[in-house]
Amino acid sequence: MAGLGFWGHPAGPLLLLLLLVLPPRALPEGPLVFVALVFRHGDRAPLASYPMDPHKEVASTLWPRGLGQLTTEGVRQQLELGRFLRSRYEAFLSPEYRREEVYIRSTDFDRTLESAQANLAGLFPEAAPGSPEARWRPIPVHTVPVAEDKLLRFPMRSCPRYHELLREATEAAEYQEALEGWTGFLSRLENFTGLSLVGEPLRRAWKVLDTLMCQQAHGLPLPAWASPDVLRTLAQISALDIGAHVGPPRAAEKAQLTGGILLNAILANFSRVQRLGLPLKMVMYSAHDSTLLALQGALGLYDGHTPPYAACLGFEFRKHLGNPAKDGGNVTVSLFYRNDSAHLPLPLSLPGCPAPCPLGRFYQLTAPARPPAHGVSCHGPYEAAIPPAPVVPLLAGAVAVLVALSLGLGLLAWRPGCLRALGGPV
């Protein structure tokens, strides 16, 4: 007797439903072809003090390099991260730094620029300071002024649309209910700190937590009122504030104005490397907890915790070993998150796509969080509409010349971003 077939089987409809609902199976991993890394700077001094801080009068002694500056511990953390990256990519990267293989960009802050340099000293020890003079060589770290940085420092403070979205989140019933429950706590904290906290942006409370945590990490005694319960409550308040910035409502639109910009740049850089056959293997971004939080929000991976110092989120692009036509392309994307040097990095999966995720599926799932082709508000007239810059300056320059010959120099003059593209990856 002939078989019932899929549709004739009593369980057929249920099996079809499971096939539609369950995420696709994971694909086998293949050889590595490109890596993008986004990491937070290392340990730093507090960003600020507060009026009743018992250590305020000796701050210049405690933090001789100044508030917000990288500490010796921060340098050590970044050296360790660089050594971890060297061990992870030993067979992928050349043993010595090659400008055509690795590109590094940082925000224009001392702590992130120094963190990038310390990281590179661990990643390329042959070129690190302290090596024999004949072998030591500095490695360039690229940056742009803070006011012009829309890739790693997002225009949240100056973006009216983002403020509308944030106001919608902070006026939501759930947010207001949580805030009301902390009114008494914040009022008591005002008496201990000398700060106005009730009715003020929650970032003020976060700054108190940041100062206390920095002091505690460096062995300084905390005031009696700063109990573990107080620190825990401050962390919960901080998580509520972060959630309003990167989470629902309208999380995807927030991402288009923040972390989706960086996500788009990472994907665009890989696309150009593949399309033009460029030798670039790795792009590194030295930035802040806010950068990582926004990127986690764009990926749907924010877990309610602030990234620790030297936390690193990695994107690994691989040629996969399956059937490209069947599995949605010949490249996969895997994510990892290193947030604790004592443990192996955590493999992450994009919601809806187990790792390694086919690149086409990755593009599809992240599309709502990335800026649309026509651009978004709060960005310049050209930057949002022009594809991110080509990577590797010399080869990109050759491509730009060919474009100029075929399209005419007038087009490049009309689109100044194309000329800016000669500076390297975004």
UniProtKB/Swiss-Prot annotation:
Q: What is its EC number?
A: 3.1.3.2
Q: Which Pfam families match?
A: His_Phos_2
Gene Ontology molecular function? acid phosphatase activity; protein tyrosine phosphatase activity; receptor tyrosine kinase binding
Gene Ontology biological-process annotations: negative regulation of ERBB4 signaling pathway; negative regulation of neuron projection development; negative regulation of protein processing; odontogenesis; peptidyl-tyrosine dephosphorylation involved in inactivation of protein kinase activity; regulation of neuronal synaptic plasticity
Annotated membrane topology:
Single-pass type I membrane protein
* Keywords attached to this entry: Amelogenesis imperfecta, Disease variant, Disulfide bond, Glycoprotein, Hydrolase, Membrane, Signal, Transmembrane, Transmembrane helix
On the Cytoplasmic side, which residues?
415-426
Q: What is this protein called?
A: Testicular acid phosphatase
For this protein's source organism, the top of the classification is: Eukaryota, Metazoa, Chordata, Craniata, Vertebrata
Q: Which gene encodes it?
A: ACP4
